[in-house]
Amino acid sequence: MISKLSVNPTFSPSYNIIVDSVLDFSHILEYVTNKQVLVVTNTTVAKLYLTKFLAALVDDLDVRTCILEDGEQYKSQQSLDKILSTLLENHFTRNSTVLVALGGGVIGDITGFAAAIYQRGIDFIQIPTTLLSQVDSSVGGKTAINHQLGKNMIGAFYQPKVVYTSIEFYKTLPQREYIAGMAEVVKYAFISKDFYLWLDSNRDKILAKDSVTLIEMVKRSCQIKAQVVAMDEKELTGARAILNFGHTFGHAIEKCQNYRGLKHGEAVGVGMAQAIDFSHYLGLISQQQAKDFNDFIVSFGISIDFPNDICQKEFLEAMLLDKKNSNKELKFILIENIGSLSLQKQSKNELEQFLDISR
């Protein structure tokens, strides 16, 4: 069973997202029109899927691999340099090269950024292997590496040639990673009331990993993101900002833990709860709404407990570095109801007071 949908960005060519019930890498062959292929993956995914992927490629291709360490802390300049050096050392050229990102969000982000900047742009293909990367980072063209002062601070908007994935990847995906991915899925429920109701009615099947339901879940999540990206590919109008619900707080958590604590999806889960509570503090939603929204997050096995190893001063400093901020104004994606999120400016003092009473 294959589900296919199209992403139509504002400034870039359209591309397909292919969600497969089985794992058949041959589906990407029609998109490998270049003769030089560099497969970027990590040590974990390489052991599980690299051999099978390489076996699916035709014999007349010049195929090389670049295997990075696994973890958010390796979404770095050093890892980027390793990819670029591999391309240069093997004389890969702009018009004959395609990069393949075989892995989760870190691999997709860093490979996409390498594709964006190598010889001013080469083709790349996304093969996301985690739920989080399937529904979020592989779609929409955001590519980046982290800096020691902030997450995703160095990057570019650059769309893939195609996204191919399969729910078969879940067979080797640790439960913790699966639940982390569910945080991004739940985020879309706060953006779309229809999806909120669908998730609510299919919760048991989702937690039981029913294959038909999971394919539909991934497809619906990608559709919501694709619709937003089509309106505001490069965050010029502000429409795309709603996709960052939970991320302002979440990114700050990751930064404070040096990307070695909560996983990205876990941090987003906590971040959504923080954004919900901040919305209540500001009078945008009632206490009952805040409870209902947080209970919805928790019902999918997602923790909303704030880490106790982060001090408030450090957390506040990390939030001040958020990319949405401008002219020293803090910007947050806040909630007024299901399907009603908005980008709002708040003062540093308002945030400090909220953090004081919420700890």
From Swiss-Prot:
Its EC number is 4.2.3.4. The keyword Secreted does not apply. Signal peptide: none annotated. Binds 1 divalent metal cation per subunit. Can use either Co(2+) or Zn(2+). It holds the Pfam family DHQS_C. It is found in: Cytoplasm. Zn(2+) binds at residues 184, 247, 264. One of its GO terms (molecular function) is metal ion binding. NAD(+) binds at residues 42, 70-75, 105-109, 129-130, 142, 151, 169-172. It catalyses: 7-phospho-2-dehydro-3-deoxy-D-arabino-heptonate = 3-dehydroquinate + phosphate. The keyword Lyase applies. Belongs to the sugar phosphate cyclases superfamily. Dehydroquinate synthase family. It is an enzyme of class 4 (lyase). GO terms for cellular component: cytoplasm. Its cofactor is Co(2+); Zn(2+); NAD(+). Catalyzes the conversion of 3-deoxy-D-arabino-heptulosonate 7-phosphate (DAHP) to dehydroquinate (DHQ). CDD domains: DHQS (cd08195). This is 3-dehydroquinate synthase. Pathway: Metabolic intermediate biosynthesis; chorismate biosynthesis; chorismate from D-erythrose 4-phosphate and phosphoenolpyruvate: step 2/7. Keywords: Amino-acid biosynthesis, Aromatic amino acid biosynthesis, Cobalt, Cytoplasm, Lyase, Metal-binding, NAD, Nucleotide-binding, Zinc. One of its GO terms (biological process) is amino acid biosynthetic process. The lineage of its organism: Bacteria, Pseudomonadati, Pseudomonadota, Gammaproteobacteria, Thiotrichales.
